[in-house]
């Protein structure tokens, strides 16, 4: 948490400095809120060798920004991704061919400073591209279940929080829907780094070191920007 607060203060300072150097005398600030769905990249569970697939997670963020120039804006956002899983079931040769189910459930909080450039301005909407960088605080719950000696056995552990470098690439479109309000639809790719590993007692084999996995996601969000 201390790392995240330090990065928050640093990001706010960087954003403030960037705005103060913007030679446009622009006081056009905005608030933003976005929500949507995320799908994680496929990853391999290092303990079982199973190739994990994602279900649909929820993602959302809030932020404050400034229209620095006619076709450029920047903002600071606090976001989260949760309720998603990477999971897979299958035979595991290292466990005698037993059918095992593995599940990794992350909880992600991220703080990003973002910049966006309008690529084209049409009568009804604008197309923009953007990039962001900052920090993510990441943890996960890892669960295994299977059959051992004729009985169904399950085990799990929760990793400790880790703070990683996070970055984001965005492509989207926005449209004015009323005075001072814009609607936005965007696709983004986000990398939140890797979780910490941990020890888990796996099906009578004693404590085993389980490695963390990397979380990268494809996100589709809709949002609103409110001029202030």
Curated annotation (Swiss-Prot):
Please indicate which superkingdom the organism of origin belongs to.
Answer: Bacteria
Indicate whether Signal appears among the record's keywords.
yes
UniProt cross-references to InterPro entries, sorted A to Z: OMP/PagP_b-brl (IPR011250)
Keywords, ordered alphabetically: Signal
Residues of the signal peptide: 1-22
What name does UniProt use for this protein?
A: Putative adhesin RBE_1271
- Organism encoding this protein: Rickettsia bellii (strain RML369-C)
């Amino acid at each position: 948490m201390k790392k995240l607060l330090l990065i928050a203060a640093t990001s706010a300072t960087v954003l403030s400095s960037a705005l103060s150097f913007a030679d446009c005398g622009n006081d056009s600030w905005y608030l933003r809120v976005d929500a949507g769905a995320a799908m994680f990249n496929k990853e391999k569970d290092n303990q079982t060798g199973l190739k994990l697939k994602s279900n649909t997670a929820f993602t959302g963020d809030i932020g404050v920004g400034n229209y620095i120039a006619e076709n450029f804006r920047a903002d600071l956002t606090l976001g989260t991704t949760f309720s998603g899983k990477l999971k897979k079931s299958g035979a595991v040769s290292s466990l005698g061919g037993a059918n095992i189910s593995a599940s990794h459930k992350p909880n992600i909080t991220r703080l990003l400073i973002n910049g966006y450039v309008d690529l084209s301005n049409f009568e009804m909407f604008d197309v923009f591209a953007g990039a962001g960088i900052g920090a993510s605080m990441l943890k996960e719950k890892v669960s295994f279940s299977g059959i051992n000696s004729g009985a169904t056995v399950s085990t799990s552990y929760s990793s400790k929080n880790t703070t990683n470098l996070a970055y984001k690439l965005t492509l989207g479109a926005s449209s004015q829907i009323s005075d001072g309000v814009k609607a936005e639809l965007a696709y983004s790719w986000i990398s939140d780094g890797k979780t910490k590993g941990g020890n888990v007692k796996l099906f009578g084999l004693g404590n085993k070191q389980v490695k963390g996995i990397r979380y990268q996601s494809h996100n589709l969000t809709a949002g609103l920007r409110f001029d202030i």
